[in-house]
Amino acid sequence: MKLYERLMTIDRRIIYGILLGVVTLPLIFPSVVKVTPMSPVEKLFTAVDNTTNDKALILDCSYSPQIKAEVEPMAIAVLRHAFKTRKKILVLSLYVEMIGLATRAINQVVEEFNSNAQTYEDSLIYGRDYVFLGWQPPPIVPMLGMGESISNIYVVDYYGNQTDTLQMMERIRNYNDISILVALSGSRIPISWVAYAQNRYGLAVGVGCTAVSGADFYPYYQTGQFTGLMVGMKGAAEYEELVEANYGVKGRRVASEAMLSLTYAHLAIILFIVIGNIGFFLHRRRK
């Protein structure tokens, strides 16, 4: 078999084997890839950073298990940022199947911080520093209703506590007391937040989404309807980089570790495309 024929007929098992290797090896032996944060992520980071002591931020963890790998690192990065800078944060999910993932992210970050806390003041205390509102159907009800009264929509929190008795909620009544809402989703939920919460109440909306949703959301960012935007694993890695670079928050950076696998996989695919094209042009020249 001639060279160009070999280049054009590489066994698919070889291709899949190489791809399997370049994807799995960096995950087995993880290392962090430093990324340069882009403007959409920097603006979201700044908006969260600018939350004042008299206001809170809302984190909407409305992502499903199918997109957990992409979006959960965003939730963890935002929570680390908020807790490190002592921002008040309300967490919610718009659908019941996403409650477990939101709980997992909160518990992980709270345990990280409290394991290093020296005093009660240093610790993250439920009801004082953060509140998990849980789930209230249908989605349009909390989107519109929280503009008037959060405690009227979420009478009790996820754990059954009366919302209006929690220390943090004494000052946080409606969207006037919220600096920004960060919506993490792989669907069109962030657009609904714009339609119902931003257009009516002027609430700032930031977004974290999957890579395939990015093209749908960039126009909203470009028009200023989205304050900031994290897209896919790269967006999560950029936010992780900002949190560590600005505040020295140490913790496993899952998105930054995954970027190495993505980079190697893309390079391998490009290499195979180049090899196939070289074989094609050699074959055509022989003719």
Please annotate each region the language model reported:
Residues 7-8, 273-287:
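Juxtamembrane interface at the cytosolic side of transmembrane helices
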Residues 45-73:
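Short extracytoplasmic
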